[in-house]
Amino acid sequence: MRKTVRACCAIAGSAALLVLPACWAAGASTAGAVEVSPRAAPAASSVTIAAVGDTMLGTTPDLPPNPGSYLDAVRPILDRGAQIVFGNLEGTLTTATASKCGAGSANCFAFRDPPGYARYLKQAGFTVLNDANNHILDFGAAGQAQTVRSLHAAGLAQTGLPGEITVVRARGIKVAFVAFAPYPYDANLLNLSAARTLIKRARRQARVVVVYMHAGAEGSGADHVTGREEHYLGEDRGNPEAFAHMAIDAGASLVIASGPHVLRGMQFYKGHLIAYSLGNFAGYHNFSTSGDLDTSVILHVTLSAAGRFKSARVYPIRFTGTGRPVPGGGGIAFTARLGTEDFGSSAARILASGVIKAP
């Protein structure tokens, strides 16, 4: 399906919506005005968003032999009725070489793909990429700036810089994206007051607001939402449940997350869906695929023009030995079980078909 998406640049602190070729300033959105496969479409009653977790096509110099076809096996799922496809870009698109990891660093990972790889993400169906995470500064401010430019040059919108609200149009409906991570160089989820203000500002610009959070501990032992502050390698990764509930109270229509690199459960709060981690989506030799890390899902959510939940479904994917996503695996049952264990009566009911129902 060809998508009709218009991305706009919204200056933080202003309710005005500006359509600009690009902007780059402290406290300002950097989502450039982008037309994606225009098609005549009157304002509709709903919009469908496909969302995936942590995504990189590889990391220099270990790159896939055929990057343009790396996501071909799951592209039909991304495109299945969705007008917007969102994912977390877990790294940079840059030629910069000055890495955050010094010689002999332990537990330090710096990810970069060539800037031209943005076009492969576009070809796979993506329309909006998040860069609020712990890897956007892997190659410093120069790497971050080149990443944003590369996405825009490929016709992709991005979100996640401090103070940033990214508004796209799909089927005539405005959808605002706001993304957070527990770092001062991102929109910081540890500052609940500032996050609440930003989400409320987004709600004034669009009736449909999607909040993304890069939050929680990492790894195969981090598949449960604890209801408490979570930490990883000494970092405070926030309280995902408290943040998600705050986001909905502030006006979010949908909350999605990744960062733990493993699936987590899903919950309904005040009628709105929260997906606490969509796990990994793609990473040629980047991510471990052992144990529970070899399975994930692609989430489709349909929201009304007023931002209310209408329907949702997860499609299971698994990873080959190189980290390439292919359809299949036990992701449906896995995330359904986790939701029941963690949230009880407020857990999303996930049927064997992947269809998601409110409790």
Model features per residue range: what roles?
Residues 1-33:
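Secretory targeting and sorting signals
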Residues 30-359:
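Acidic, metal/ion-coordinating pockets
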